[in-house]
Amino acid sequence: MVQPKVRGRRAEKKSKEVNTQPEDYSPNDRSELEENDDKVESNPALKTTFFGLVDSNEIDYFKQAESTLNVNAFDNDEEREGFIRSVLEEARGKELKLVTNQICSKLMERLVLFATDRQLKNIFRQFSGHFVALAHHKYSSHVLETLLVRAAALIEKELVNDFKQDEGEVDDEISQDNDREDEAVVSMETLFVKMLDEFNPHLKTMVDHQYSSHVLRLLILIIAGKELPSTTTSNSTLRSKKSKIARKMIEIKDNDDFNRSFQTPPSFKDQLRKLCNSLGSKGDMKHMRELAINKVASPVLQLLIQVEGIVDKERTFWHLIFLSENSDKNPQEEAFVEYLLSDSVGSHFLESVIRNGGARMKYIERLYKLYMKDRVLKLSKRSTTGVFIIQALLFKLKPAEVLFILDQIIPELASLISIDENQNLELGKNIIDASISRDNYRREELIEQLFVKFAPNYDRHNPSADTSSEFLENTLHLTGSTLGNTRDDWPTAQERRRSLFLEKLMEYDHSFVVCTWLNFLALPIARFIQMCYHGVFSHVVENSLVVIPASEGEPKSVLIIRKRFLNLFQNEIVNLACNSYGSHIVDRLWNFTVLLNMYKDRIGSELASESHKVKESTYGRLVWKNWSMELFVRKKFDWKSLVKNQEEEYFGVGSHEGQNSTERVKKPIELKFEQMMKEKQMKEERAQKAEEGFNKRKNNEFEYGYDNDNKKAKIRGRNR
C-alpha cells in the first residue's frame, strides 16, 4: 500500500535534522517511539476517514451561514436561535463531512458554541462511533474540543438538576428513529463515558499525534475536574501557539464555559483511573523519557503527572520517568536530567512539573539536590532552558534552599541580565519577588547590582540634576525602537518585555522612580512627549507617577525633582487627555500633584481653557470626570475642598477636628490585625459571660437540689 505523504515542510525538515542529544543519553536507531508511529500508520481505525465531499452549493450556503453567525446580526436571541435551528436542519446527516471540511468546520464550531443543551446532545450522538477519526483530523479535532467543553458544562448542569428542555424547540430537532424518546432522556454523562470507551483502545497512539493529543489533553482536564483553559490566551495549555493565532484570525471567541472548572460525577474518577492505567501499562522508562522530550507528547505527560495523584498514590508516571525518592545519583538519570536542562522542550517539561504541582515535594528536592544545587549559577546562564527551572524552584523549595539560590545569583545578577539579547529579564523580576517573599533578603545588595548594570554613573544616594538618560537607554533601548515612527508600527514584544521589567524596578524601590524622573528630564522634551503617546512606553511614564508615602517622608530634594518633572507636561495636558494612552497619564497626575496645588490648578486651567475639545473626546470626557472639572469650572471652592481632602488622606488625617495631623496611615495588614484583635476580644467576653452563667446555674442546682431530670426537689428540715 502506498504510504501517505508527510504533511508540511517542517516535518520534512525535522526528519533531516541531526540528533543533538548527549552521548550518555542516545536512543537506539529504531526507538520505541518510532515503532509506535508505525503502529499508528498500520492501525486501520486511525487512517484518514473519508466522510464525503461538500458540493459547491452547500459550501456557499454554509459559508454564508458562518458569516451571519460571525457578525451576529440578530435583533434578539430568539431570532438567532431560530436561525441556528434552520442551519442544523439543513446540516442533518451531513455533520461528519462538514466538520472535516476547512470552511464548514468553522460553522460547526460556531453552532456548537451557540447550540442549546438538547441540540448539543444531538450533535454529540451524530459523532458517536467516529470520535477517534475526528480527533485525528486537522479540522474536526478543533470542533471536537469545543464540543467536549460544552459537554462538560452540560454534565455539571445535569448533576445539579438544572437541565431543562427548551420550550421553543420543535420535534424535528431530534432524530427520526423510533427510539428517539429513549435517546432524548440519555444523560450527557452516559454519552461522555461511551465516548471515553471508544477512545480507550487508541489512547497510546493519541499521546504523540499532532491533532488528537490536544483532544486527549482536554479529556484529561475534564475527567480530572481541572480548569479548562481558554483557547485564545497566550499561556493556554490547550492549544499550540500557531493554533491560538489562527483562532484569533477567524474570530471564534470562547463562551462562558471556558476558563473554569466543572463539577464531575463520581464515575469520572474511575474513568481517570482507567485512562491512567491504559497509558501507563506496559510502559518502560526509556519510552516515557522519549515522550517527555517529544514536542507533541510532552504536554500530555505534564498533565498526567499533574492529575495522577487523584487516583494513583504510587505516582506511576513520575516513577516511569525518574527514580524513586530514596535512590542515589544514577548516571543514566543524570544524563537525562542534563538533557532536560539543556533542551527547550525538556526544560519546559521539567519547569511545568515543578511549577504546576502534581509531583511531591520530596521528588523535586531530590532532583534539585542531586543534579542542580551545585551548579545553580551555571544553569542560570542558560537563558533559554535552565534558567526557567531555577525560577520555578525559587517558589517551590524550602526557605533555606531559596536563600541559597539567592546567595548564588544576586552577586552575579548584573552579568546574567542582558537587555540587548532580552535574556533573563524574567529572572531579574523573579529574584526580586523571591527576595521580597523572604523578608527583603539582601535587598540593598540587589538594588546596587541593578544600578551597576543599568545606571553605573548614577548615585542613588545623592541624585543630581546633571544625570544623563543612560538608565532609560539601557533598560528600554529607545534608540532604534518604534518610538517616534510615523508608519504606525506596532510596539514589539521586546519593547513590551523591557517596559515591564522597568516597571517592576520602579515598583520595587522608589530610588528607581527618582532615577527615571531625572532621565526623563535629560531627554529632549519632544522625545518625552512621544513616549507619552507610545503604546508601551506610555505605561512607563504612567507608572513613574508615584509619590513617597507620608509615613516615610519625601525629602526636599525629591520634591524639587518632582516639580521639575511636572513641568514637562506643561501645554500638553489637553492633547494627552484626548489620547487613549495619554489620558491614563493625566488621570495619574491627580494623585501625583498632591501637596503641589499650584501644579494641580495649572492642569485644571489647561483642561478648562479647551473644555470643548476635551468634552468632544471619549477619553477626554473620562479625564474631565476624574478631575471633577465641573466643580473646577462652576464651584471652585468645592473643588479645592476635594484637594484638601486628598491631602488629609495622604497624611492619614480624619475629617473631624482635633485629630493629630502627623498620624501615620495604617497599612491594610495593620487594620486587619486590629479587626482580628477586636473579634478575639469579643469572643473572650462572650465566653466569659457564658461561663459565669454556667457557674450560676450550677450553684442553683447545688443550692436547690436538682435531680438528674433537672426538676427541683423539696428538701424538708432546717438544712433545706
UniProtKB/Swiss-Prot annotation:
Gene Ontology MF terms: mRNA binding
Compartment annotation: Nucleus, Nucleolus
Entry's Gene Ontology cellular component terms: 90S preribosome; nucleolus; preribosome, small subunit precursor; small-subunit processome
Listed name of the protein: Nucleolar protein 9
Pumilio repeat placement: 90-125, 126-161, 198-234, 278-318, 332-369, 371-407, 523-560, 567-605
Predominant localisation class: nucleus
Family: Belongs to the NOP9 family.
Function: RNA-binding nucleolar protein required for pre-rRNA processing. Involved in production of 18S rRNA and assembly of small ribosomal subunit.
Comp. bias (Basic and acidic residues): 680-701
Compositional bias segments (type: Basic residues): 1-13
Residue ranges, annotated region (Disordered): 1-40, 680-720
GO biological process, one term: negative regulation of gene expression
Keywords attached to this entry: Nucleus, Repeat, Ribosome biogenesis, rRNA processing
Name of the coding gene: NOP9
A Pfam entry, by short name: PUF_NOP9
